[in-house]
Amino acid sequence: MGLRLTTKVQVSGWRFLLRRLEHAIVRRDTRMFDDPLQFYSRSIALGIVVAVLILAGAALLAYFKPQGKLGGTSLFTDRATNQLYVLLSGQLHPVYNLTSARLVLGNPANPATVKSSELSKLPMGQTVGIPGAPYATPVSAGSTSIWTLCDTVARADSTSPVVQTAVIAMPLEIDASIDPLQSHEAVLVSYQGETWIVTTKGRHAIDLTDRALTSSMGIPVTARPTPISEGMFNALPDMGPWQLPPIPAAGAPNSLGLPDDLVIGSVFQIHTDKGPQYYVVLPDGIAQVNATTAAALRATQAHGLVAPPAMVPSLVVRIAERVYPSPLPDEPLKIVSRPQDPALCWSWQRSAGDQSPQSTVLSGRHLPISPSAMNMGIKQIHGTATVYLDGGKFVALQSPDPRYTESMYYIDPQGVRYGVPNAETAKSLGLSSPQNAPWEIVRLLVDGPVLSKDAALLEHDTLPADPSPRKVPAGASGAP
């Protein structure tokens, strides 16, 4: 009896009946107007193919680049202990931090995680690295360099006020409670027994006992200076003392053709469409002065004049005009109350492309940072400031002495500055394009060790103990 072969039509019909039976069981519908079940089988087939490809790729990766094995790099991390090791001349050396390892290798390599059994196959050397160096050197993003130094005085009304210094390296939060000084505002401060007045330009020495000067400036007799820190004193530019330059031969008759009662050193005025203009008589001419200078000159010596006499403009224009270098501003000042506005800040900012930095003096009720950033402050142990940073900084400082080149520093998020000797060292740490920063503020940060390759290649038995550590505050997690 011969074999009876099936035809394609029979096979197709059999498959159709099976599909129809599936629809009857799963969907309870045998009409088969559509066939959604076909997608299930296709997805299963596709999933199997993808799984096979993934397994094949994993097998190839494990063969050509096995995990936990030596080879391909000289920087390793023990998978069991997380100890960092660097391979030097066939010896495996423990290293204190990633920064030291990168300095040793000369490139910003990342460690490969290796099994302890693999590391034990290599001869072991002494620990190398720079004690006290940062573990790594991350840098916060941003094209604008902003550095701010703030003094906050507590108990300003008392006989022993306390000054707290803060270093801020992050964008500022400026609002009505803390904002830049206006041209008519000033702050009275003291440093080492001397009195200074701080304006938008900087600090000026002033003698509060000179009532002729202070009354013309609108400084009340009840105004009292409050102390500032050494860092703030050095950061604020010295704009010279606020005192009137002496006038030679003051009180002598003039030889300029003016009335006899206008002796040298006296003040007169002319009326213009913009208001009165004041002039002081000098030995060889006259000099225009602002209203505050005129008031100060008259309060010092009025030369018998009850009020500045008015002169005819046509007479004045025929007299030689000179310059009287008065440092006083154009209008009386409003003295900021430190008990109400205890924070005094000097801010330095330079953006990419700026030819020179911009500095601003601010005053207000609190530090110019957000409330959330207030909790980020780090009170340094060996420094005098509390530091607020939004990440690491790589900065370049230009020395005012032309004999010296610029200095580069890496500043970690804890506010410790580390010297970077040159651009090659910076490159090995993954640092580039340093931002400018003011030495007046950076100098207040705690100075860490220099990050150099020679220092990283030194071997150590143990780390020296910190001679003056600080106990963790009570109430902190894990503290007694």
Swiss-Prot record:
Keywords, ordered alphabetically: ATP-binding, Cell inner membrane, Cell membrane, Disulfide bond, Hydrolase, Membrane, Nucleotide-binding, Repeat, Transmembrane, Transmembrane helix, Transport
Subunit structure: Oligomerizes, possibly a hexamer. Part of the ESX-1 / type VII secretion system (T7SS), which is composed of cytosolic and membrane components. The ESX-1 membrane complex is composed of EccB1, EccCa1, EccCb1, EccD1 and EccE1. Residues 72-342 interact with an artificial EsxB-EsxA heterodimer.
Name used for this protein in its record: ESX-1 secretion system ATPase EccB1
One biological process term in Gene Ontology: symbiont-mediated perturbation of host innate immune response
Manner of cofactor binding, per the entry note: Ca(2+) has 50% activity.
Phenotypic effect of disruption: Disruption abolishes EsxA and EsxB secretion, but not their expression. It results in a lack of antigen specific immunogenicity and leads to attenuated virulence.
Free-text domain note: Has a discontinuous central core of beta sheets stabilized by a disulfide bond that is flanked by 2 structural domain repeats on each side; the protein forms an elongated 'S'-shaped structure. Repeat A2 (approximately residues 265-323) is farthest from the cell inner membrane and is quite mobile, swinging on 2 inter-repeat loops (A, residues 234-264 and B, 324-341).
Region entry Structural repeat A2/3, spans: 265-323
Gene that this sequence comes from: eccB1
